[in-house]
C-alpha cells in the first residue's frame, strides 16, 4: 500500500508540476495586453481582447460587417467579399509601428490596410490604402502572382523570398508594418522581408504602371484609418498594437523646378506647359475646367508662390484636394481671379461654395497684369492667406481640418484664360 501510495503521490506531483508549467506559460503568453515596458515606450492596443470597441464599418459609424470576438481573438466570419467586409479603426494614424498576430483558414485570404481614406466616392478601402497581404498560398485555389503573396505590399512591392518564414494555415504568425515619414518596412515572424520608400519617382512609376494606374489617389495619403479585410475566408487576429512615431516637419519643397512639369499630373484637356522658366496655364479648345495637381499630398504646409494674370485671370490654388473622376478635382480653392472677384478667398468646390470672401476694400491689393505674391498657410483646421504681404483671410473650418490631399492649380471653364506662375515653394508643418 505504501508503494502504491508513493507512486500515486509522485504521479499527482508530476501532473501538478505540468499544470503549473502550463499555467505559467499561459500567463507568460497573455494576449491582448501590454507589458510595462511597452506602455512606457508608447505602445497602445487597438483590440482589448473582449470587444470591438474602437472599430467600425468602412465609411460607416457603427460595426455591422462580419466580425466578432471569439476566445480573445477578432475573427472574420468569412462572409465578406471584394466589395464588403471591411472593418476600420475609429482613429487615423500617420507614422507608426503596427504589430499583430494572425491565423488563416485553409486557402484563406485577408489583409491589413493602412492610410485608408474614407470618402463617399470610394466604395472600397484599397482604392486609397496600401495593403500588407495575408494569404494561404499553398492552398489558395488560384494561381498567385508574387505581388499577391503573403507579406507583399499588395500589387506594388514583393517580399524577399529568402527571408520568408510563414507558418501554415491554422498556426499563428506575427506581422509588423513600419511607416516612418515615407520609409516603409514589412516584417514577418521577426524578420524584415520588405522595405521601400513611398512617394519617390520610382514609387510613382510603379503605381502608375500596374493595378493602381486607374486609382489616382492610391497610396498618397500621409494619414488614414487602419483596416482589416474579410475576403470571404475565416481569419483570426490578436495582439493588435501600435506605436505612433513623430512627424518630421520643416521640409523645404520646390514644387516647380522651372524646367518641366515633373512632380505634377494634368487633368483635363486645357494647356499646361513651361516657357522661359515659367509655368503657364492656358485655356484649350475645349474651354473646360483643367487642373495641374501635385503627385504627392501636402496636408499641413506654408506655401508661397507668384502669379501673373496675362489674360482673363480666373484660376485658383486648390488645397487638400483629390481627383474624383476624370478631370473633376474636389477640395478647397484659394481664389485667383480678376479684380472684384475675391482673390485670396476660400471656396469649396462641389460643396458649400464660398466659405469666406474678402472685403471690397481689399480688392485693390491685387495687381492685374503684374506679378503678385500669394502665401497660403494650412495647419489643422486653420487656413490663412496673404496677397502681396496683406492678410486676406483667416478661417477655421472642421471640414477642412478633416481633409487631406494634393495642391492643384486650376483653369476655370469658359476659355480665354492665361495665368503664369513661378517660385512655388513650400515648407511642411
Could you tell me what each predicted segment is?
Residues 2-15:
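Bacterial N-terminal signal peptides that target proteins for export
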Residues 24-28:
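Sec/Tat signal peptide C-region and signal peptidase I cleavage site
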